Regions:
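Signature of N6-adenine DNA methyltransferases within the class I
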Residues: 2-23, 30, 36-64, 71-203
Length: 203
């Protein structure tokens, strides 16, 4: 097996338990995108759907049927009802140059993790009423390097679910303090379901 490219490609793959929990949070039918499918943890569950697409940058680990491309380079023809996945966690200084050259750095600095750019672009790829269901480090909620992202999320909808797992090891061998969360475009309820109950989340 090829070693995980943790530093440069952020390849920390998703367990079945996490995949099932995230798929259960899905509220939309229709088109679905997995923007960084890795070895196919999510893709294996959704690939038979009529309007499903998965993208993976690394051809050596990509699941069968996935499109081999850099997510930031691919020109999408359509928007999506659901975008789901586990975007790569890569510190700014470790982002491969080919990918870095594709990123819009106008609103971000050198503290920004690659997963932040994934979230930003995914917002733009949502249909009206579309949803993002991601597992990411929880820190983007209050990180100053993510101020633009949080403003964009707030202006476009609501994080309807935010499950903070703290130090629980969601990934085998890795514990990056993650949260599983759902964002809904054009929903302005400002109500977020957490493990502790529903609360108002102001980003």
């Amino acid at each position: 097996m090829k070693p995980y490219e943790v530093e440069s490609l952020g390849q920390v793959f998703t367990t079945d338990e996490v995949v099932e929990k995230m798929l259960a949070m899905r509220e939309n039918t229709g088109s679905i995108l997995e923007p960084s499918c890795g070895d196919g943890a999510f893709w294996s569950k959704i690939q038979t759907e009529k309007h499903a697409l998965a993208i993976e940058i690394d051809p050596t680990i990509a699941a069968p049927g996935a499109l081999i491309s850099d997510f930031f380079e691919y020109k999408f023809k359509n928007k999506f009802n659901t975008i789901i996945g586990n975007p790569p966690y890569v510190g700014f200084k470790k982002i491969p140059k080919n990918t870095l050259d594709l990123l819009n750095l106008e609103y971000y600095d050198k503290r920004t993790n690659l997963y932040t750019f994934f979230i930003d672009r995914c917002i733009d790829l949502l249909e009206d009423g579309g949803e993002i269901i991601f597992v990411t480090p929880r820190s983007f909620i209050n990180a100053t390097s993510c101020a633009h992202l949080n403003s964009k999320l707030y202006e476009n909808g609501t994080i309807t679910h935010f499950y903070d797992y703290g130090d629980k090891m969601l990934f085998k061998g890795f514990s990056p303090n993650c949260a599983i969360w759902r964002f809904e475009k054009d929903c302005f309820s400002r109500q977020t379901l957490t493990k502790e109950g529903t609360r108002t989340m102001n980003l």
